[in-house]
UniProtKB/Swiss-Prot annotation:
Name of the protein in its database record: UvrABC system protein C
Subunit-level organization: Interacts with UvrB in an incision complex.
PROSITE patterns given in the database record: GIY_YIG (PS50164), UVR (PS50151), UVRC (PS50165)
Organism listed in the record: Zymomonas mobilis subsp. mobilis (strain ATCC 31821 / ZM4 / CP4)
Protein task: The UvrABC repair system catalyzes the recognition and processing of DNA lesions. UvrC both incises the 5' and 3' sides of the lesion. The N-terminal half is responsible for the 3' incision and the C-terminal half is responsible for the 5' incision.
Origin organism lineage: Bacteria, Pseudomonadati, Pseudomonadota, Alphaproteobacteria, Sphingomonadales
């Protein structure tokens, strides 16, 4: 998010937008005061009209830092940019001879602009990064994968702070405790957590689970927990384990190792060989973690290392995370819209988006420095209590680290290009098999999931020539009360009706890339014709529909494919296209089942207290801490409810009435 400094300065920010057609003013959450200024041209791409529209705005632009947005005739954002001097930067778009073909196309589509001035260029950079992630304009360099990274949380804010828990965490950091990360992937967190459980035996359960245990759980049996819930370890000994965990995650692994060796030798000298074996196993777990995190980071304690490589129109940036001199994994990013742009500019745009919602370490190493290095350093440093610096090492161990990141980026591109070549050939085969008009750019696959009609959900996954587009996945909670439990046809009707009625309203011309070229349905002829009828009700007839059904005995590898015209196909068991279509179906099935399980788990953990008006998370927690269970809350007297911390007499009366007053 934007730094506090930037937020304060936005109150000094001036929006400029003149509306030639007296359009209504749009509000924006970044400013208090707005003056609207729109510059419009024709509805069709026209370079002269685009230059004229941009030229009009130059008359009012100051020589101040700020951010500009370019819109097409439909009001869609084409591009978000920032400038040290707005007038000079925007003027460049009127010099056609100096623009690349791609930027000329953008100018020809531009019909209006929005300008926001900021106090400093650093603030403009942070605002630009936030707007790019918010609107994902087609002419900006975009991160294809901008999900948050996972952390390990040593949680100490629960019911039993004397027994901290070790958990994985992703998202907003609300819980009290120490966060360690980021880790590059969920797999790296899982691997580290498993090893930490073997090494330090800290609990990983929730406070409610911990409170209600009467005997040790399975983790104790497999030696991954010390069972503090039932007193198998004292508070002091458990606190020592928590301290060792903090030391290890803070990079003091040698200190922890020496401590374990000393304890093992002492147990052996005391002829307590069983205890010595426990310390031996913990040392093995420590060695395993160290072997998987070993990296020669030189003098770097906390750093991010970036390497960018471009080839065949594809760009990849590899990032390595060094925390407390430990390698916490690496992650590959693939970038869109980098045509004809210097790699310094690509790195500038990428890093601005990357750190928009992440904490930047002190040291950042790259093989190409960002084009506005000083501005980016100022922007990132304004959010921290230390100075963030970018480096481009030329020799030594740090250069080897950057080279390693670049090498990984090259290998990732090689793999992606090989996969793309294979996938393109498979899509060509699909065109011939299913009689499609063109190679499908967007394939949508649908599936439903439920158990005996409960927790009914639908799932939609999206794939294209580049693979799965996970940012476009959608989940649907089945809402219609008239659907009979387990009626797959009616569930599919609701899902498709909601999906395409919304799309039809937003884009009746079918010009958006959100429209699919092919629908792949898990089912046979009946499902295919049902989907055809559902789309026809929406006035949609230009989308190909294919059903995939299990063959005889429902054996995988003997699937049949059903078209709208009634034709049916089967592919050889060793067909690459068959394997690809199975992957699409299985991914939709996995996504739908995962959505269903999450909904079911949420319902299983719901409480009658959730239905009491005026009872939020804090009061619910206070009630459960005081009484133990929702049943005890329900059976409590009014005077007992009034004794709970944070529960007033009025709220106590409200709770009591909810559970004890019968309907008239």
């Amino acid at each position: 998010m934007i730094s506090k400094i930037v937020l304060k300065s936005f109150f000094k920010t001036r929006w400029m937008r003149h509306d030639l057609n007296n359009e209504s003013q749009e509000t924006d959450r970044f400013s208090e005061k707005q003056t609207l200024d729109v510059f419009k041209g024709t509805d069709h791409p026209d370079l002269e009209k685009g230059v004229a529209a941009i030229g009009n705005v130059l008359k009012t632009l100051p020589l101040r830092p700020g951010v500009y947005r370019m819109y097409d005739s439909k009001g869609n954002i084409l591009y978000v940019g920032k400038a040290r001097a707005l007038r000079n930067r925007v003027a460049n778009y009127t010099q056609i001879s100096g623009l690349s073909r791609r930027i000329q196309r953008m100018v020809s589509q531009t019909r209006s602009m929005t300008i926001v001035t900021t106090v400093t260029e650093s603030e403009a950079l942070l605002l630009e990064a936030q707007l790019i992630k918010r609107y994902r304009p087609p002419y900006n360099i975009l991160l294809r994968d901008d999900k948050s990274f996972p952390y390990i949380l040593l949680k100490e804010d629960g019911t039993f702070p004397q027994f901290p828990s070790l958990q994985r965490h992703r998202g907003v950091k609300r819980a009290k405790g120490k966060y360690y990360g980021p880790f590059a992937s969920a797999d790296s967190v899982t691997l580290t957590l498993n090893s930490l459980q073997k090494l330090f035996l800290l609990r990983s359960c929730s406070d409610s689970f911990f409170r209600n245990r009467k005997r040790p759980c399975l983790l104790y049996q497999i030696k991954r927990c010390s069972a503090p819930c039932v007193g198998r370890i004292s508070e002091d000994d458990y606190r020592d384990l928590a301290v060792d965990t903090r030391d290890f995650l803070a990079g003091k692994s040698t200190h922890v190792q020496k401590k374990l060796v000393t304890a093992m030798e002492q147990a052996s000298n005391d002829l307590n060989y069983e205890l010595a074996a426990v310390y031996r196993d913990r040392l093995k777990a420590l060695a395993f973690i160290q072997s998987h995190q070993s990296i020669n980071s030189g003098n770097l304690r906390n750093a991010d290392i970036f390497g960018i490589e471009c080839r065949a129109g594809l760009a990849c940036i590899q990032v390595f995370f060094i925390r407390n001199r430990q390698n916490w994994g690496h992650h590959a990013y693939y970038l869109n819209h980098i045509d004809e742009q210097p790699l310094e500019d690509v790195m500038q745009s990428f890093l601005g988006q990357f750190y928009e919602d992440k904490i930047a370490p002190k040291d950042i190493l790259t093989n190409y420095l960002p084009s506005d290095k000083n501005v980016l350093e100022d922007a990132l440093s304004s959010q921290r209590d230390y100075r963030v610096k970018f480096y481009q090492p030329q020799r030594g161990e740090l250069k080897k680290l950057v080279d390693q990141a670049v090498r990984n980026a090259k290998e990732a591109i090689d793999r992606r290009l090989a996969e793309a070549s294979t996938q393109k050939q498979l899509l060509k085969e699909m065109v011939n098999l299913f009689h499609l008009d063109k190679i499908p750019d967007r394939i949508e696959v649908y599936d439903n999931s439920h158990i005996m009609g409960s927790n009914m959900v639908g799932g939609m996954i999206v794939a294209g020539p580049e693979g799965f587009r996970r940012n476009s996945y959608r989940k649907f909670n089945i809402k219609s009360p008239s659907i009979n439990p387990g009626d797959d046809f009616e569930m599919m009707r609701e899902v498709l009706t909601r999906r395409f009625s919304r799309l039809e309203r937003s884009d009746p011309d079918h010009s958006s890339s959100e429209w699919p070229d092919l629908l792949l349905i898990d089912g046979g002829k009946g499902q295919v014709h049902a989907v055809k009828d559902i789309l026809a009700e929406q006035g949609i007839s230009d989308i190909a529909i294919v059903g995939i059904s299990k063959g005889p005995d429902r054996n995988a590898g003997r699937e049949h494919f059903h078209l709208v015209d009634g034709s049916e196909y089967a592919l050889p068991p060793n067909s690459g296209l068959l394997f690809y279509l199975q992957r699409l179906r299985d991914e939709a099935h996995r996504f739908a089942i995962g959505t269903h399980r999450a909904k079911r788990a949420k319902n299983l953990t719901s409480s009658p207290l959730d239905e009491v008006p005026g009872i939020g998370p804090s009061r619910k927690k206070a009630l459960l801490l005081h009484f133990g269970t929702a049943r005890d809350v329900k059976n409590a007297s009014l005077s007992e409810l009034e004794k709970v911390n944070g529960i007033s007499s009025a709220i106590a009366r409200q709770i009591y009435d909810f559970f004890h007053h019968s309907p008239a």
